[in-house]
Amino acid sequence: MSVMSYIDAINLAMKEEMERDSRVFVLGEDVGRKGGVFKATAGLYEQFGEERVMDTPLAESAIAGVGIGAAMYGMRPIAEMQFADFIMPAVNQIISEAAKIRYRSNNDWSCPIVVRAPYGGGVHGALYHSQSVEAIFANQPGLKIVMPSTPYDAKGLLKAAVRDEDPVLFFEHKRAYRLIKGEVPADDYVLPIGKADVKREGDDITVITYGLCVHFALQAAERLEKDGISAHVVDLRTVYPLDKEAIIEAASKTGKVLLVTEDTKEGSIMSEVAAIISEHCLFDLDAPIKRLAGPDIPAMPYAPTMEKYFMVNPDKVEAAMRELAEF
């Protein structure tokens, strides 16, 4: 077991899956010789060649469409959108085609495509390089949406996504790429899509979150532990479909629940999590469900001070946790 960065774990997962299965190939903008703008595909072109690591035009609808067609033909495409913000031209392909192929063909066709995309702010990317788009797709049966927080989870879940028989959107927080490091087993392992993970056991309050915010919650929990407040931290890992059993269990355990997302609040993944808790845990709650999210404004600002105001961070999570604990 070695320690590696979040992005290296993603790169390794693709490499191992391409070695394991000749049907797996990568396509996207600058994924070839350049290795991707974040170097997520570095070294793949040199090892597998241009037939399996394909540079594409700047046309996200084409990237998705070609990948969907290849998946229906029996291949295992990993289609990279350079930034999650740019996935919008491909929405019709993903929602109208990939998500519905199995249903409308009465199981005659499947679409085992993985669409990877870096999301999130904190890197001064402003309007078109900082968005969180997961909620746009999170009411489309037929899709799965995975958003890992650690290198270990990233590798295991990406492998699972490649082997899945249906389309998977795999969103990676770009700020986590080199910031987050962790132990990753050398052996071949997969993690189940659709299952949350308890990252920290606690008894006083529950924090449910995903992606980079998991690390903020863990940092805040360590601070609160010194004051005798025990936080239970749950990482959703898959944001669609949600692990309802894990959500209900975590909410019922403490009776005080904080939901954290970098996305804007209204209509977010956490809105659905709150609905699940309200429907199933109402009489187990000792406080109103609390949400911490980005402000409901059109886009992430560019100015560093304004970006900081928008972003969730450990201090904001800690303050929200303290307020909830004191209720």
From Swiss-Prot:
InterPro entries: THDP-binding, Transketo_C/PFOR_II, Transketolase-like_Pyr-bd, Transketolase_C. GO terms for molecular function: 3-methyl-2-oxobutanoate dehydrogenase (2-methylpropanoyl-transferring) activity. Its cofactor is thiamine diphosphate. It catalyses: N(6)-[(R)-lipoyl]-L-lysyl-[protein] + 3-methyl-2-oxobutanoate + H(+) = N(6)-[(R)-S(8)-2-methylpropanoyldihydrolipoyl]-L-lysyl-[protein] + CO2. Keywords: Oxidoreductase, Thiamine pyrophosphate. It comes from the Bacteria. SMART domains: Transket_pyr. Thiamine diphosphate binds at E29, L58, A59, E60, Q82, F86, I87, M88, P89. GO terms for biological process: branched-chain amino acid catabolic process; response to nutrient. Its EC number is 1.2.4.4. The active site is at H129. Substrate binds at F83, A84, D85, F86, H129. The branched-chain alpha-keto dehydrogenase complex catalyzes the overall conversion of alpha-keto acids to acyl-CoA and CO(2). It contains multiple copies of three enzymatic components: branched-chain alpha-keto acid decarboxylase (E1), lipoamide acyltransferase (E2) and lipoamide dehydrogenase (E3). NCBIfam families: PRK09212.1 (NF006667). Heterotetramer of two alpha and two beta chains. Directly associated with ODBA in the E1 complex. This is 2-oxoisovalerate dehydrogenase subunit beta.
